[in-house]
Amino acid sequence: MIHWEQSRTLLSFPQVGLHLSWYGIFFSLGIFLSSFAGIRLATVLCKDPNMRKELKTGLENFALGALLVIVIGARAFYVLFYGGSFYFENPSEIIKIWKGGLSSHGAIIALVIWSAAFSRFHIRRLPMLSVTYICDICGAVFGVAALLIRVGNFMNQEILGTPTSMPWGVVFANDSSLIARHPVQLYEGVSYLLLSLVLYWLCYRGSIRLGSGYSAAGALIGVASIRFCAEFFKTHQGSWLGEESLLTIGQWLSIPMVFLGIGILWIASKKREP
């Protein structure tokens, strides 16, 4: 059994009212490292040396916009699906993301939309920047960000797991029940990282071609499946569905992602047919 009493705040500057949380640091670091890995993967695999610099610049611009878009999408989904009536009664609280409340499903949807928009405005200059190309890169490198974000959740003592008698059960100081719980944040984060590493390796060695859609489809199906299973080890979240509901909000939101991934796989397979 592990007793976890880590403060949610990494650095505090009360003189200026600034408090840096573990979650915020890990979130930012994760996005940066995943972006770096994605740009590196794309430039290494680019066969035209004259295009590498321009491709690198384009993907750097994509990554900068993605950071903002991910936060907006993740917050919007949290407010809609997990906030219940609270945010409708207190709309000024919606912008206070430093208090917590981001949804990974919203982040994924926002990233796909941003990929489509970015591709539309840049594909004439860089024809390789198709929606599937960008999404394939994201699918191959998302794991670092996903892991660090879940580590941030663990450090913040949020998204608690169900009770367990296993020796690695964690007693969180902020949990009033003070009972050992599954460190489900780490289960989920490590699973995402392993999935992403497999996809990255397949892309790097050429088994999956960037732009084919296979990496994006694999990531969507894999992430949704991992999330669906992880929900069984989480305490109840959200207020739209009661604890007696057959599935959680997270599981319901994961189901369309599986079908979307299957649809992309089907389209990709049709393109390969002679």
From Swiss-Prot:
State the annotated membrane topology for this chain.
Multi-pass membrane protein
Which pathway is this protein engaged in?
Answer: Protein modification; lipoprotein biosynthesis (diacylglyceryl transfer)
What's a single GO MF annotation on this record? phosphatidylglycerol-prolipoprotein diacylglyceryl transferase activity
Is Cell membrane included in the keywords of this UniProt record?
Answer: yes
Its Enzyme Commission number(s) read 2.5.1.145
Q: What is its main location?
A: membrane
Q: Write out the annotated subcellular location.
A: Cell inner membrane
Annotated Pfam families: LGT
Determine the domain of life of the protein's source: Bacteria
Which BP terms in the Gene Ontology apply to this protein? lipoprotein biosynthetic process
Where exactly are the transmembrane stretches of this chain?
A: 16-36, 62-82, 94-114, 129-149, 184-204, 213-233, 247-267
What HAMAP family does this protein map onto?
Answer: Lgt
| Role of this protein | Catalyzes the transfer of the diacylglyceryl group from phosphatidylglycerol to the sulfhydryl group of the N-terminal cysteine of a prolipoprotein, the first step in the formation of mature lipoproteins.
Q: What family does the database annotate?
A: Belongs to the Lgt family.
NCBIfam families for the chain = PRK00052.2-5
| Cross-referenced PANTHER family | PHOSPHATIDYLGLYCEROL--PROLIPOPROTEIN DIACYLGLYCERYL TRANSFERASE, PROLIPOPROTEIN DIACYLGLYCERYL TRANSFERASE
**What is the name of the protein in this document?**
Phosphatidylglycerol--prolipoprotein diacylglyceryl transferase
Which species is listed as the source? Chlamydia muridarum (strain MoPn / Nigg)
